Amino acid sequence: MFSKEYWLSSAKKSKSVKYLAIIACMIALKIAVGSVRIPVSENLRITVTYIVVALESTIVGPAAGMVSAFVTDNLSFILYPDGAYFPGYTLTAMLGSLIYSLCLYQKKITITRIAIAKTINNYLVNVAIGSLWSSMLYGNAYIVYATKSLVKNTILLPIEIVLSYMTLFTL
């Protein structure tokens, strides 16, 4: 997982026309799917973009996946601006892609691997880091955002794991 070859195999995919086309399609799909969301509160929304991110991370790996996450986040902001631009969210998208890649790239797809990736993403990325960004942007206490995000992510976690598994396993 942390070998030089592991990272190089992912980086090489960004130089292949075939994989560049896949990455471009995934970027377009993430933007389209991400534009459909259910608002929960001022900073919380429900989407199914995580399925596309997991799929892309499984195919292209960490290096290409993080570049794609960077491009997707910035294009999404240009096409669907929602408040002020904040680079922390770009880093969050890249970290989410990295976590999926480390758990799924060049590995057998299992419910356990998906559950680990989704749990880390939900609690570390969405709750811990996302709440920090919301607190910095909107000025309320960190605990206010963390509590709301914790409830939402805990409720959705089993559903997201099952949907991710059904999608990735059938492909």
Language model features by range: what are they?
Residues M1-L171:
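Loop-helix junctions at membrane interfaces
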